[in-house]
Amino acid sequence: MRVVILGSGVFGVASAWYLSQAGHDVTVIDRQPGPAEETSAANAGQISPGYAAPWAAPGVPLKAIKWMFQRHAPLAIGLDGTSFQLKWMWQMLRNCDTRHYMENKGRMVRLAEYSRDCLKALRDTTGIQYEGRQGGTLQLFRTAKQYENATRDIAVLEDAGVPYQLLEAKRLAEVEPALAEVSHKLTGGLRLPNDETGDCQLFTTRLAAMADQAGVTFRFNTAVDALLHEGDRIAGVKCGMRIIKGDAYVMAFGSYSTAMLKGLVDIPVYPLKGYSLTIPIAQEDGAPVSTILDVTYTIAITRFDQRIRVGGMAEIVGFNKTLLQPRRETLEMVVRDLFPRGGHVEQATFWTGLRPMTPDGTPVVGRTAYKNLWLNTGHGTLGWTMACGSGQLISDLISGRTPAIPYDDLAVARYSPGFTPARPQHLHGAHN
């Protein structure tokens, strides 16, 4: 089957890899000169299924009001003048209750756990290197309340069969030795030993090279003008004067998927702006070993080989990609506070990207009302975590194979009134 994939970020490339391995003739189209040039370029670098959770959570509306008056707030809102943004925020607000939070988190953990298994299998099969580490991740608490609230997430982890360790402050240095110097600032942490880290751009670039060798065609520097349709099928992709045709099409344009699908499929995917710093290592014994997630500021600090990646924050401001100095100062403040000897912060590279986010936090992966159009977008801040599993899922569905995990509630149809999953829903996913 000829499959055309729109987008060469980690989702487009992962989809291309798995589809090519399934025997399909795959073409990838992207306006950029190479893979992973946008959202996949400099994300936080964590592969953390256990921390998979929607931003729409109990208490977030009140916190959002408080954050409006804080200098180092993890969330900021700026009206972009569109009714779509207002509708999206209203939908997000409706998901900020315990029932929706647990349901959405369950979906996210299921896909994320499966995705990590797929990544491991890919790594074992191909030997792909991407400065990855399998040292687990550590969520840090600065208040007693944060430590107590961890029990809510632990319930979901236990239901999903995810190993964890709840650590008091004095034990944090057992897994991250450099934290011994700042343990007095912390109340404890939640460690997930099975989580991983890695450079998403490096992974995507190398997987794209492997896919190219396997026969995948990459059409870079190619802007897509429109999807053409005839009846209930997509007829081609218009790129300037050229029309590229296939038997099946996969939309993996990230935040730009919504506009490209306008008039065809309505998806509630909105850009969530995030920032990162990439910092050269200064002192080895003062740097993190794996990934730290500071709950107070929702900022991740990740160790690559000789670099530290500091990423986080969320701005609901549309497609504005301006690099704001106050956001850089927040990232610098957190990494200096936790790892004062770790990196040469003054030499850091500052970056921003737009994560494609749904109001319920769960990505949109699966079929549409068009018989040959599939979606792989909306993964928000967990794109790297969910990439391989989503690519394998798309490949299975297009190939007519039964996926290894329940998938009906990941498709766009879940936003339709009266939607009921066709398969029993549970959290165990890849553990079945």
From Swiss-Prot:
Disruption phenotype: Cells lacking this gene fail to use alanine as a carbon or nitrogen source and become sensitive to the presence of the amino acid in glucose-ammonium minimal medium. They exhibit a glutamate auxotrophy when ammonium is the sole source of nitrogen. GO terms for molecular function: D-amino-acid dehydrogenase activity. Disulfide bonds: none annotated. InterPro entries: DadA, FAD-dep_OxRdtase, FAD/NAD-bd_sf. It catalyses: a D-alpha-amino acid + A + H2O = a 2-oxocarboxylate + AH2 + NH4(+). Signal peptide: none annotated. Its cofactor is FAD. Its EC number is 1.4.99.-. Induction: By alanine; slightly repressed by glucose. Is activated by the Ntr system, mediated by the nitrogen assimilation control protein (NAC). GO terms for cellular component: cytoplasm; plasma membrane. Keywords: FAD, Flavoprotein, Oxidoreductase. GO terms for biological process: D-alanine catabolic process. Transmembrane segments: none annotated. Pathway: Amino-acid degradation; D-alanine degradation; NH(3) and pyruvate from D-alanine: step 1/1. It holds the Pfam family DAO. FAD binds at residues 3-17. Belongs to the DadA oxidoreductase family. Catalyzes the oxidative deamination of D-amino acids. Participates in the utilization of alanine as the sole source of carbon and nitrogen for growth. This is D-amino acid dehydrogenase. The gene is dadA.
